[in-house]
A protein has these predicted regions:
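Interdomain hinge/lid region at the active-site interface
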Residues: 176, 185, 220-287, 291
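Rossmann-fold NAD(P) dinucleotide-binding segment
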Residues: 59-71, 75-121
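NAD(P)-dependent dehydrogenase/reductase Rossmann-like domain
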Residues: 278-322
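Beta-strand segments within the central parallel beta-sheet cores of soluble alpha/beta enzyme folds
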Residues: 206-216, 267-271
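Rossmann-fold dinucleotide-binding core
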Residues: 103-183
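NAD(P)+-binding Rossmann beta1-loop-alpha1 motif at the extreme N-terminus of oxidoreductases
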Residues: 1-71, 96, 164
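Active-site-proximal catalytic alpha-helix in oxidoreductases
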Residues: 137, 142-144, 166, 172-203, ...
Length: 322
């Protein structure tokens, strides 16, 4: 046990110091918890350390932690962190808690709970939502499931990182199921917002006026209101990338297939994000899905948003179509 644990303050490891992980780790640190952060990126670790956090050069430095928070990108990274060559399973002290926050398939979350349980470790299936700003403020929404002991053990961390914790069930998989519903809606809303803006621009409407009117009308959505400003500013710095929704909507599709349930609206959004990824925009902000419409219809996007391969000031589609 670490000194901090002996004094009643759990030692918390955060793996994944990207947009969400960096903010969450800093919120935990500023709440008084003993936090050590790890990321494969030197730049991410240095940024965390520059803001007062303690960073580690390798995952093995987190084996003394009582709680490990996973804020990685996907299920493959979860597997690598826990069961890979430098994996924490088998190194963490029995009774330690893993809080898994990545968006993964519900079936993977259930299997993960079984495997960690067999290793003497507890799992809280706890995907998050809210974005980088809320992560930094410790104001995330957490969709969690796990047994009562896991919730009790996680309480200091959840109190520091979340505005709302939804306690959804007593076993892993329920939290990930709810997150999948959220991601279906989020992905569809972003793709629809892009299509609506593209149509309005093609009709000759002023982009800023579209935003002003729609955000005060029944067609508004949280994603429209949050993402369209990125388009208006021509700023595609990724807060959540196109690649994320290619991954998440693929999980929606695969889960629907397992359940013999069609998800045609989500499938359409997935195709648009996949097209954006194929066009080279995978690492840009998810609002860059609008650039697919630019390439197809030649619309003139605001300022730096313009894609040189798709932009035609006469409004013609690429290839010279009328």
């Amino acid at each position: 046990m670490s000194d901090s644990s002996q004094q009643g303050v759990p030692r918390v490891g955060v793996i994944g110091l990207g947009a969400m992980g960096q903010g969450t780790a800093l919120a935990l640190h500023e709440s008084g918890l003993a936090v050590v952060g790890y990321d494969v990126s030197d730049r991410a670790r240095e940024a965390f350390a520059a803001q007062g956090g303690q960073s580690a050069a390798e995952p093995a430095a987190l084996v003394s932690c009582d709680i490990v928070l996973l804020l990685v990108v996907n299920g493959e990274q979860v597997e690598q962190v826990l069961f890979g060559e430098q994996g924490l399973v088998g190194r963490l002290t029995p009774g330690s808690l893993v809080i898994q926050c990545a968006t993964v398939a519900p079936s993977q979350a259930r299997r993960l709970g079984e495997r960690l349980g067999a290793a003497g470790l507890a799992l809280l299936d706890a995907p998050v939502s809210g974005g980088a700003a809320k992560a930094r403020a410790g104001q995330l929404s957490v969709m969690a499931s796990g047994d009562a002991a896991a919730f009790d053990q996680a309480r200091p961390v959840l109190d520091a990182m979340a505005a709302t914790v939804y306690r959804l069930g007593d076993a892993p998989g329920v939290g990930s199921s709810m997150k999948l519903v959220n991601q279906l809606l989020a992905g569809v809303h972003i793709a629809t917002a892009a299509e609506a803006m593209a149509l309005g621009i093609r009709l000759g409407l002023d982009p800023d006026t579209i935003y002003e009117v729609i955000t005060h009308s029944a067609g508004n959505s949280w994603m429209f209101e949050n993402r369209v400003p990125h388009i208006l500013q021509g700023d595609y710095t990724p807060l959540s990338a196109v690649d994320i929704f290619v991954k998440d909507l693929n999980i929606v599709h695969e889960t629907g297939r397992e359940l013999a349930m069609s998800t045609p609206v989500a499938a359409s959004a997935l195709q648009q994000f996949t097209a954006a990824k194929g066009a080279g925009f995978g690492r840009e902000d998810d609002s860059a899905v609008i650039k697919v419409y630019q390439r197809l219809s030649g619309i003139d996007l605001p300022e730096a948003a313009n894609d040189p391969q798709g932009h035609d000031p006469k409004g013609n589609a690429p290839g010279g179509g009328a």
